[in-house]
């Protein structure tokens, strides 16, 4: 047993040292990738806290706040139109208990006059525009705006239509594939491999496991975006479980596992942008950026823009005029 320890302990120690060394210096093993478009402000569902979600009015409002990224979910109508809609069933959004794929585009109902904001329970969004929009309409109006498109189910027709629309509008590099399931992402990637992709849920767990095993520096990462919920919003604005104690437990565990500056910094050094979602309060903005996140996804683009502008003003050096005034006062 003792001779075995003489071999195991030095080997383990060397492995730990190498892992830490390359975790901090991944450029020695991997070619650095510069982000095509930096993201600070991402608008969730087009900015669903200030206008009705996924409407053109919401998108225009977000763009007025200089949003860097628009996030949408895609569904397919009966007549083959890709529409921007979070839900497949329309009952929550419109009161009509029908699926999007059972209606033609022209038959889609109006949104309700107010919709509860999922990540701000008890708060409701309103707007004068209640029309559902097609992805093509958004591409036409904002041809050079980066967008993240989530496909929720393995629908080959939907995936290929999204891929072809992206090609037709020559926006492969600024349109992100997103999916919860790896099986769906595999098909998205096959339909248009030129589009960058975000981590799926399984891939996110896998990356975390590799990080804690010390293997992450030695593994390739094809994804360019890591969209992750901020653990501090669990049991406050985000309730993944019905039981309160489960939410509290998950908040504690995920806070310990995910909120690691060294992990975020390593991913960024590998060319992966890290964004936390879906944050709607200034205190959460502060936590996310203090961890080193590239950006934040929010329902309230105006609130996040005010926060970012305020932070920029505080970090800017004093202007010459201000310095001269101070010297005169002295």
UniProtKB/Swiss-Prot annotation:
Segments on the Cytoplasmic face: 1, 222-330
E.C. numbers: 3.1.4.-
SS bonds (residue pairs): none
Binding-site residues for a divalent metal cation, renumbered to this chain: 71, 73, 86
Reaction catalyzed: 1-hexadecanoyl-sn-glycero-3-phosphocholine + H2O = 1-hexadecanoyl-sn-glycero-3-phosphate + choline + H(+); 1-O-hexadecyl-sn-glycero-3-phosphocholine + H2O = 1-O-hexadecyl-sn-glycero-3-phosphate + choline + H(+); 1-O-(1Z-octadecenyl)-sn-glycero-3-phospho-N-hexadecanoyl-ethanolamine + H2O = 1-O-(1Z-octadecenyl)-sn-glycero-3-phosphate + N-hexadecanoylethanolamine + H(+); N-(5Z,8Z,11Z,14Z-eicosatetraenoyl)-1-(9Z-octadecenoyl)-sn-glycero-3-phosphoethanolamine + H2O = N-(5Z,8Z,11Z,14Z-eicosatetraenoyl)-ethanolamine + 1-(9Z-octadecenoyl)-sn-glycero-3-phosphate + H(+)
Molecular function in Gene Ontology: lysophospholipase activity; metal ion binding; phosphoric diester hydrolase activity
Subcellular location: Membrane; Cytoplasm, Perinuclear region; Endoplasmic reticulum membrane
This protein's record includes keyword Acyltransferase: no
GO terms (BP aspect): N-acylethanolamine metabolic process; phosphatidylcholine catabolic process; phospholipid metabolic process
Region (Disordered) location: 311-330
Pfam families: GDPD
Membrane topology: Multi-pass membrane protein
Expression across tissues: Highly expressed in stomach and kidney. In stomach detected in the glandular epithelium. Predominantly expressed in the stomach (at protein level).
Activation and inhibition: Lysophospholipase D activity is stimulated by calcium. Loss of lysophospholipase D activity in presence of EDTA.
Function recorded in the entry: Hydrolyzes lysoglycerophospholipids to produce lysophosphatidic acid (LPA) and the corresponding amines. Shows a preference for 1-O-alkyl-sn-glycero-3-phosphocholine (lyso-PAF), lysophosphatidylcholine (lyso-PC) and N-acylethanolamine lysophospholipids. Does not display glycerophosphodiester phosphodiesterase activity, since it cannot hydrolyze either glycerophosphoinositol or glycerophosphocholine.
Entry similarity comment: Belongs to the glycerophosphoryl diester phosphodiesterase family.
Name of the featured protein: Lysophospholipase D GDPD3
Taxonomic source organism: Mus musculus (Mouse)
Lineage, broadest ranks: Eukaryota, Metazoa, Chordata, Craniata, Vertebrata
Protein's gene: Gdpd3
